[in-house]
């Protein structure tokens, strides 16, 4: 007593299990009311935040292109012609906050740069209102060898930045001081 027999209720158990498992795996569970409210609140200002992200990123890219310690800037408008043209065609509201840079000095320069940042948060996530930075070769990709790093598009001197909505002068000042320190690398004792 008390048991429902699937054959008698007409339920397609395999379908129900698959639908539930796939939906939970692919979409996650339903949001809690507080989380849904927080998302709605955040969506109200997303256009303003993205506008500021994009404006700041473009100013940072212009600064980085001229800095002596930066060998390459990776940004939508800095790619070869077909990619830059597509970015200009499809990304009408701006090109986003993600900026990649290659530094002179390899892995030591990358580590020193990250350690010298004062305002940027050193984290692997993206899309925050705060400015974020990571040196993949010494963190998320540190277990890979040179060949695997190259296959994943990461070099020893690559740094990924996500430009936040702070005042752009503060962002550039922090990047400048960290870039200048990156060329010095680690201090070594002299005998």
Q: Residue locations for each model-derived region?
A:
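Active-site C-terminal subdomain of aminotransferase-like
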Residues: 1-98, 102-130, 137
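PLP-dependent enzyme catalytic core of the Aspartate aminotransferase-like
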Residues: 115-116, 131-191
């Amino acid at each position: 007593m008390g048991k429902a027999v699937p054959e008698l209720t007409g339920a397609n158990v395999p379908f129900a299990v698959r639908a539930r498992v796939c939906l939970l795996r692919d979409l996650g569970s339903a949001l809690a009311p507080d989380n849904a409210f927080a998302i709605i609140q955040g969506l109200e200002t997303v256009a303003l935040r993205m506008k500021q992200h994009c404006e700041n990123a473009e100013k940072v890219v212009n600064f980085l292109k001229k800095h002596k310690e930066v060998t390459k800037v990776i940004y939508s408008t800095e790619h070869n012609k077909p990619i830059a043209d597509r970015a200009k065609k499809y990304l009408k509201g701006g090109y986003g906050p993600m900026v990649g840079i290659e530094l002179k000095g390899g892995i030591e320069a990358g580590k020193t740069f990250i350690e010298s940042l004062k305002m940027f948060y050193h984290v692997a996530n993206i899309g925050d209102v705060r400015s974020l930075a990571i040196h993949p070769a010494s963190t998320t990709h540190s277990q890979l060898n040179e060949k695997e790093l190259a296959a994943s598009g990461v070099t020893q001197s690559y740094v990924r930045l996500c430009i936040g909505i702070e005042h752009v002068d503060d962002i550039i000042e922090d990047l400048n001081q960290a870039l200048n320190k990156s060329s010095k690398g680690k201090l070594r004792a002299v005998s």
